[in-house]
């Protein structure tokens, strides 16, 4: 297995390609246009709010319009705006719990407003009721036909659709199906059921990655060589290999004096891994399957308990109960 910190690691390349710690995603309405589900539901919500707002003004002119319906309009305006901003900034997974809570309250408000308006024989009140029903429904044609005949008590509602979408985990089958049509979202493959995180940061430095041995040639030492063997360097004292042996020095230093890249051997890598302490324990809240192209990552199942060496950054160096070590995404783990 490649040592941690290897520049060939795909995970390290992902973390170094412009994703810094605390960096916020930019606001882009292209994410809404490229997501058919978000584009359709937000468009219906905006249209419904405009219809309800204009109809409410006309109804208030005739008199007898319930004041509670105005609060519903204000609340739903901020709900629609909040969903729009979170989708445009790709922050749905960060704020999905808050979105579900606000939409649940909005569902109560809209249905209460519909109940206060839909039974009125006054035309502006019926138009306002149609707008509020549309705020609670996913299909425009169902709303129009139902508002002309009877209250659409059994019609699907966009709050319910949004609550069902944002209240489900990313690996849910219906949410994965909806996300598969979005252009900006990474489509989950058949091998993986994990949510996608876009906020990468630098991998926490470990003893293996942060302690690169310093190599010196005999000419550089210029008489300061030690006469006793040095632990961890094959061939005895430093500089002895160049004089008495044909074995390349540690780090790929051949006898011709041309240095190669310093790469630790397998035994030394295992020794350094064994010296790493794992003072933290974390429980997996999602299943994770390691990237087959990156030998540094480890796979684990939901509810697995891992030992963690460092909890800084988005990737943690962890050890499984069977002794396997590697890196794991921190947003799949919770500290115990």
From Swiss-Prot:
Species assigned in the record: Leptosphaeria maculans (strain JN3 / isolate v23.1.3 / race Av1-4-5-6-7-8) (Blackleg fungus)
Keyword field contains Nucleus: no
Name used for this protein in its record: High osmolarity signaling protein SHO1
Superkingdom of source: Eukaryota
Record keywords, A-Z: Cell membrane, Membrane, SH3 domain, Stress response, Transmembrane, Transmembrane helix
Keyword Transmembrane helix in record: yes
Record topological domains on the Extracellular side: 59-67, 118-119
Family to which the UniProt record says this protein belongs: Belongs to the SHO1 family.
